[in-house]
Amino acid sequence: MASLRKIHPLMKITNDMVIDLPAPSNISVWWNFGSLLGLCLFSQILTGLFLAMHYTSDISTAFSSVVHTCRDVNYGWFIRSLHANGASFFFICIYLHIARGLYYGSYLYKETWTIGVVLLGLVMATAFVGYVLPWGQMSFWGATVITNLLSAIPYVGGTLVQWIWGGFSVDNATLTRFFTFHFLLPFIIAAATLVHLLFLHETGSNNPTGLNSDADKVSFHPYFSYKDLLGFLALLSALTSLALFSPNLLGDPDNFIPANPLVTPPHIKPEWYFLFAYAILRSIPNKLGGVLALLFSILVLVLVPILHTSKQRGLMFRPLTQTLFWTLVADMLILTWIGGMPVEYPFVIIGQVASTLYFLLFLVLAPTAGWLENKSLKWL
């Protein structure tokens, strides 16, 4: 008789996804980040639920309710620290997951990749509205500046901003709706993640060589389930260490000051994981141009499969495109650094050069390198 996990309607789905799933035998540690993102999402939803029990979405009490959670709730300080730093780990895993997809050509699974880009947008939206909730100085001014960018949209911009604010400025209505979105979006992300997995399991996983691995598959459990557990252990150790030893390392000191609409912070900036996009936004002197550049800095990922010109899938045997990939990594780090700097010389010009290079790498240099590599294969 067949095992229950293979015939029960619900257990069969789980079995096909995480137990008897055929996986390429040579996938490396870079394939761990998908499961780590699942762990991050679960951790964020869990800690977020406990924080929501003690939070009040009213401008007069929001800041105090966060202070109350940290001071008076049992282990409230730890839960908040895990949640705030968990967001940073979430984005570290996302960026590494995308980098692996770019390096090994996983973007050629177009449906999986497109849903992944949608997931990135949803996670960014969730993190942005979540950053507003403590109602500190940087929360308030970050919300004001970023939502105000929508006013650059012709004809409907002004109306759209007022509609999002729920009035003529960032106020109580804004905080209430941002809390609603922050509570709702993680569950939408969880649903989109299932769609992401559904599309992935239609094709099966890619592997480091970029070659067909049908002849060399192993079952997901126990080989990769234990490998994922080791990743879980490493991530949770790093997260708890940061939350316990240096919980405010990645935060902004201005957010310890309650929001004051009459005092502007000397330098408004988002959390570190948005700095690269913020640097691209600031590099364009025109408001609408900056908003479009910000939007396309994420949407350019959708074009990657379309602009793939190489006959080979990954970058394992493509030294020219490998060089461009590591140039992109360096460029992202430079943009992240520039996003945290004041708007003055020489940071402005460095940001503009780095932003131009960012788009050139995706739209021009990578497709050209792929074409040149195809040509070079004929010369060998």
From Swiss-Prot:
Its cofactor is heme b. Gene3D superfamilies: Cytochrome Bc1 Complex, Chain C. The chain crosses the membrane at residues 33-53, 77-98, 113-133, 178-198, 226-246, 288-308, 320-340, 347-367. InterPro entries: Cyt_b/b6_C (IPR005798), Cyt_b/b6_C_sf (IPR036150), Cyt_b/b6_N (IPR005797), Cytb/b6-like_sf (IPR027387), Cytochrome_b (IPR030689), Cytochrome_b_C_euk/bac (IPR048260), Cytochrome_b_N_euk/bac (IPR048259), Di-haem_cyt_TM (IPR016174). A ubiquinone binds at residue 201. It is found in: Mitochondrion inner membrane. Heme b b562 binds at residues 83, 182. One of its GO terms (cellular component) is mitochondrial inner membrane. PROSITE patterns: CYTB_CTER, CYTB_NTER. CDD domains: cytochrome_b_C, Cytochrome_b_N. Binds 2 heme b groups non-covalently. It is a multi-pass membrane protein. Coiled coil: none annotated. GO terms for molecular function: metal ion binding; ubiquinol-cytochrome-c reductase activity. One of its GO terms (biological process) is mitochondrial electron transport, ubiquinol to cytochrome c. Heme b b566 binds at residues 97, 196. Pfam families: Cytochrom_B_C (PF00032), Cytochrome_B (PF00033). Its main location: mitochondrion. Keywords: Electron transport, Heme, Iron, Membrane, Metal-binding, Mitochondrion, Mitochondrion inner membrane, Respiratory chain, Transmembrane, Transmembrane helix, Transport, Ubiquinone. Belongs to the cytochrome b family. The cytochrome bc1 complex contains 3 respiratory subunits (MT-CYB, CYC1 and UQCRFS1), 2 core proteins (UQCRC1 and UQCRC2) and probably 6 low-molecular weight proteins. Heme 1 (or BL or b562) is low-potential and absorbs at about 562 nm, and heme 2 (or BH or b566) is high-potential and absorbs at about 566 nm. This is Cytochrome b. It comes from Lampris guttatus (Opah). The lineage of its organism: Eukaryota, Metazoa, Chordata, Craniata, Vertebrata.
